[in-house]
């Protein structure tokens, strides 16, 4: 049984648990063990009004800490009843934390567990995760289990995966079975952080917990990220039999994965399953399919999908057009590529720099230099070009066609326009000069490349050695080593 399949073993009835958002947020006494006194109940209104007044002062006065006591000399700000009312009336939880720290530093104030839990929960509700972590570290108190579960979720969402796992383990050591939401949040955090080993370690500990659509989504994503796309598909089919639909993202993930490995039969099955479950493929998914087909030299099949999209009333965007144009260029079908190019422009989609470079590269492969220069000049007129991508495309193309001097002109213009040449730029020029027996120019660039701390390619090194007609030992003695 595959790893993914073995995890879909059983489903458990939902456990009754506290909702962390339904904890006490309206503190009236510091301890639940103490009954409210009549005078405390009578003063509740005054505490509420005072809390509103202080909240306003904190928002509007920059140095409220220096004047608050003198403004209200007879008021006991350390009264736990007041602090509870302040937490309710203050919209900004960071202001509440600020007041708490001021209270602790100016009064002999020892907050009780209820106040601490309320403030900690408010920080989590406000997604102030780092502040909540600092608060927990400085106070050293032990939050309620429901808050710890919420804390795990917040840490995971913030990308603090190891911290989330640590708190999750604290709950486990306390004998508390975390909810399916908490478990899923930790697993999803591992996926986002690309920690697949940690994902599978944790999931093995969770095999008896509840399964839901989110868990299936996490498992399939993990299998696809690990290269087990087929196992992910099998898990999808099992989940759907149980009525667990993982959503459009998972279908897109599987489709992309099958496209990358060239399994178009399974890709088609996933696409039809997706539609059957009322998830209509987005243009992004169709772009992935077209790209995958083109990568596997199936441009005709890709164009059939592209054409069907238009026939069915879809409007392919610039990315889809560029993907199809690139596929045609890679195949050498430049006439078809240009036809789509002008169709795209006619529909109001302006080509971007990447699209121009696709066409330039395609025409370089065919040796159509005049068309290359036409596209390049048009790109410059439209405000593109002058970047590392476009400069390297032109330099490599010119050098491959014996036009290293033209390539060198672009190289010189790079520094004038603030574009710093990289190793690809230098290596292309070195090979280009050597190809035209301009070894001195190539050697000069080689030394410049080394001086900049960049690494020459093996092909550039071999071209120099070959044209200088020297052995590797002589080249090494002249400091022409690769590394």
UniProtKB/Swiss-Prot annotation:
Keywords, comma-separated and alphabetical: Repeat
PPR repeats mapped onto the chain: 144-178, 179-213, 218-246, 247-281, 282-316, 317-351, 352-386, 387-421, 422-456
Gene3D superfamilies referenced in this protein's UniProt entry, alphabetically: Tetratricopeptide repeat domain (1.25.40.10)
PROSITE patterns in UniProt: PPR
Short name of any one Pfam family annotated for the protein: PPR_2
The keyword Repeat belongs to this UniProt entry's keyword annotation: yes
Protein name as it appears in the record: Pentatricopeptide repeat-containing protein At5g18950
Species of provenance: Arabidopsis thaliana (Mouse-ear cress)
